[in-house]
Structure formats: structure tokens, C-alpha cells
């Protein structure tokens, strides 16, 4: 299998599972994507910020333990981001509270941007920069994707210039089709939308593909969408057709649903 250089930029957090909050896991869209790409055998680099605290040390350790390069992990004054999560009996998660901590306001430094330009593909997670990094990478000719679903503020959800725009429509087929249309007309070259238990769709405007889910015994869905993104990106950049890329994302997402957290890790105390 060919190995590629991937970067994931943006959010990290400590997922605190309720009730009560007695155990925690390292997570976040960009972190989870980076870890899953590394676990697939690729070179993965994480670009983001942590606090100078115990939670920041947990994030750094989680990345290193999974082979993700932390050369561009920055420490800032303030707390590491955290999320309080409740899990339903069916394994679905409810985000009770989010504190973005030092992830808020993070921007790659000039030297970081030069490093990003050397990557085969860059994925952006939650990033409150008004789309500045997306536009700069696109103008530099870098393949870049972003998960629009984790960026709630309108200023941060543009798709123009994206090689791949990812989104989530729940199980609403009509909304999924609208998102595909909006991403493509908005300037993304490829649109990929997950539909929960109904699977996923992808289209580049000329070719469309769909995939169902892989049934598993669900323990926790946290990070399943991030794993889907990693699996899809890795397959797509290797030249696999849209349908096969969706299947790769589906299979990795299904595996993630069989354990707690966005990637296999031992729980840590709060």
C-alpha cells in the first residue's frame, strides 16, 4: 500500500463521558482523523494547540502513542479544550457542554503553513478562522478537505476551493441531496455526506455513489464520522473509485463504533 503524507489541522479536546464525569478520552475531529490515518499506515501530522495542563499532556501522549507527528503541536496559555458527553443506551452520544479552550483563535504559524504546503492532503477540522486557511491552501494548490458539520459559525463553513467537502445530514435523504448540491455549487470539487444509519453519498457533479452501513454491535458512536473521513480520504487519494472510497470510510467508521472514543485508547481519570 502506498503511504501518503497527511496533515489534520484544528480541534482537539478531552472527551469527558457522563454520568458522572469519571473517565476521559482524547478526541476532536482533527485529532481523530490524524490518528486514524496514522493507524492506516500513513504519515500523519497534527497542527493545533493545547494548554499547558494535564489535559494537554494527555492529548500529546495520545498522538505520540498512535504515531502522529507532533512537531507542529503548539502550547498556549489557557485550558485544553474539553467536551462533556452523555451516551444513550443505543450508543449514540449527546454533547452536553463544549469548551474550545486554546483551540479558539488557533492559527498555523508561517513556518507551519510552509510545512502544510508539502503535504499530499490537508484536512481541516473545527477552526474559527473564517475560512482563511482553506483559501490559502487552495490558492497554493494543496489538496484540502474540511468537515463542515463541526463548524457551526457561518463564517467558518465556506466550501469554495475544497478538494472534498464533508457534511452530515442525519438520516434525512432530502437534506443529504441538498448538501451535495450546495457543496458542489459552492465551489467544492467533491461532496461527501453521511446519513447516519442510512449510509453515505458522494458526488463530483459527474459521478455519484452511495454506500450503506456495516452493521456492528454499537458501543459508542463518538468519532465514527471522523473515522469515515479518514478512511474515505486515504482511499480516494490512492485513486480508488468513489464507491470504494465510501466503503473504506464506512468500514473504518463501523470499527470505531465498537469501542468507546474516537480511536482505541485506555480511559483516563478526569
Question: How should each PLM-predicted stretch be described?
Answer:
Residues 1-21:
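Positively charged, low-complexity intrinsically disordered leader regions
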Residues 1-5, 177, 181-270:
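Conserved phosphate-binding/catalytic region of the ribokinase-like
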Residues 6, 43-44, 70, 142-144, ...:
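Hydrophobic anchor at the start of a short beta-strand
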Residues 14-24, 42-121:
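Conserved N-terminal subdomain of the carbohydrate kinase-like
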Residues 23-37:
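Short catalytic helix/loop segments, enriched in acidic residues and glycine
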Residues 34-43, 235-238:
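Alpha-helix C-terminal capping segments
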Residues 117-118, 131-143:
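Glycosyltransferases and closely related glycan-assembly transferases
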Residues 138-210:
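Conserved phosphate/ATP/ADP-binding segment of small-molecule kinases
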Amino acid at each position: 500500500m502506498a503511504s501518503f503524507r497527511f496533515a489534520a489541522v484544528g480541534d482537539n479536546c478531552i472527551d469527558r463521558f457522563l454520568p458522572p464525569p469519571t473517565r476521559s478520552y482524547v478526541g476532536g475531529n482533527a485529532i481523530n482523523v490524524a490518528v486514524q490515518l496514522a493507524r492506516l499506515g500513513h504519515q500523519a501530522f497534527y497542527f493545533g494547540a493545547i494548554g499547558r495542563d494535564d489535559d494537554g499532556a494527555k492529548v500529546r501522549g495520545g498522538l505520540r502513542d498512535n504515531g502522529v507527528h507532533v512537531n507542529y503541536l503548539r502550547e498556549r496559555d489557557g485550558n485544553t479544550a474539553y467536551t462533556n458527553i452523555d451516551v444513550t443506551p443505543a450508543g449514540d452520544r449527546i454533547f452536553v457542554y463544549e469548551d474550545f479552550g486554546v483551540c479558539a483563535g488557533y492559527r498555523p504559524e508561517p513556518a507551519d503553513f510552509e510545512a502544510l504546503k508539502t503535504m499530499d492532503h490537508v484536512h481541516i477540522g473545527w477552526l474559527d478562522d473564517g475560512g482563511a486557511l482553506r483559501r490559502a491552501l487552495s490558492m497554493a494548490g494543496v489538496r484540502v478537505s474540511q468537515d463542515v458539520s463541526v463548524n457551526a459559525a457561518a463564517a467558518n463553513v465556506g466550501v469554495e476551493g475544497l478538494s472534498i467537502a464533508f457534511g452530515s445530514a442525519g438520516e434525512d435523504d432530502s437534506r443529504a441531496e441538498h448538501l451535495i448540491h450546495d457543496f458542489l455549487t459552492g465551489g467544492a470539487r467533491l461532496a461527501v455526506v453521511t446519513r447516519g444509519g442510512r449510509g453515505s453519498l458522494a458526488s463530483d457533479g459527474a459521478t455519484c455513489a452511495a454506500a450503506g452501513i456495516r452493521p456492528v454491535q454499537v458501543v459508542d458512536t463518538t468519532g465514527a464520522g471522523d473515522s469515515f473521513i479518514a478512511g474515505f480520504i486515504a482511499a480516494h487519494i490512492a485513486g480508488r473509485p468513489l464507491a470504494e472510497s465510501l466503503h473504506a470510510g464506512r468500514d473504518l467508521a463501523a470499527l470505531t463504533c465498537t469501542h468507546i472514543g474516537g480511536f482505541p485508547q485506555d480511559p483516563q481519570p478526569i
